[in-house]
């Protein structure tokens, strides 16, 4: 298994909660990621979205763009409009030689609404998922044809959150719609992370190695507390600091021949969990787990 290790800037800056945003410049964020050992970073709000400006900054720290979030609206939107919306990021990512755009469906999502309890997440009918899967397939085929594939991010508090919802989307979409497997989000949603890999390994093109603190998740009142409440309480963390068995997760991915990026992505309070410390811990754990496989490139 050939693996590359990246990290997301959400540990330094949280776009949804200002209170969880450390006052760190782009250069300092990249420096800390490099010091921790990472060679890739997903984009965030402080990234200039053009390689003329960003390229020299990345080169200074030996970091490449290993993906980045796009707030999708195709569930309730039009394919042609979605093409227009993603075009600028697509051109930037092609220039950056990024592996994919992380497509997160935000239509009807409550992931950024602090007042919306977890139990009020959007729920789609089977018919709606079928129609959505068809649209996503056409859109994913177009993106790949343009030279920049998308990786679909199942996400807490969004329309495709649970294992059953993901199964239905995968069953009603084509191979062009690749999957971003996020262990933390799937575990938080009550899914069996290894079973999800078993079922959808052929579609997985990108991996977020997000861990969870089971003790925090178990105590959440889903009828009262929101996704952002859970984040503030520390539901997520890096591998080696949480409850998930990443030995089994990485072994299962390797058994199916996964090769690509493993991205540490764990939003939490930077005052309680300093980003550099967390980055070092996450990187060290992934290196430890992959050492026997001699797989990090």
Outline where the language-model segments fall:
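Active-site acidic/histidine proton-transfer and metal-coordination neighborhood
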Residues: 79-178
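Conserved small/polar residues in nucleotide/adenosyl-binding loops
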Residues: 296-297
């Amino acid at each position: 298994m050939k693996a590359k290790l990246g990290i997301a800037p959400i540990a330094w800056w949280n776009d949804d909660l200002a209170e969880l945003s450390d006052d760190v410049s782009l250069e300092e964020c990249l420096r800390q990621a490099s010091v921790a050992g990472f060679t890739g970073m997903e984009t965030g709000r402080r990234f200039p979205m053009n390689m003329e400006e960003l390229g020299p900054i990345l080169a200074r720290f030996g970091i490449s763009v290993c993906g980045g979030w796009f707030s999708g609206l195709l569930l309730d939107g039009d394919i042609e409009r979605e093409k227009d919306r993603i075009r600028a990021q697509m051109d930037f990512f092609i220039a950056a030689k990024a592996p994919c755009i992380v497509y997160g469906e935000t239509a009807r999502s409550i992931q950024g609404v602090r007042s919306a309890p977890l139990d009020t997440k959007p729920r789609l009918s089977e018919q709606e998922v079928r129609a959505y899967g068809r649209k996503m397939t056409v859109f994913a085929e177009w993106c790949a044809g343009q030279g920049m594939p998308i990786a679909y991010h199942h996400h807490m508090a969004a329309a495709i959150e649970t294992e059953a919802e993901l199964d239905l989307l995968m069953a009603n979409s084509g191979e062009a719609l690749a999957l971003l497997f996020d262990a933390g989000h799937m575990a938080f949603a009550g899914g069996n992370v290894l079973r999800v890999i078993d079922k959808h390994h052929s579609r997985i093109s990108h991996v977020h190695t997000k861990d969870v603190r089971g003790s925090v998740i178990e105590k959440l009142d889903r009828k009262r507390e929101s996704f952002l409440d859970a984040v503030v309480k520390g539901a997520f963390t890096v591998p080696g600091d949480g409850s998930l068995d990443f030995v089994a997760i990485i072994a299962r991915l390797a058994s199916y021949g996964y090769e690509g990026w493993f991205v540490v992505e764990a939003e939490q309070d930077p005052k309680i969990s300093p980003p550099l410390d967390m980055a070092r811990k996450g990187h060290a754990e992934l290196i430890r787990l992959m050492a026997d496989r001699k797989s990090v490139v």
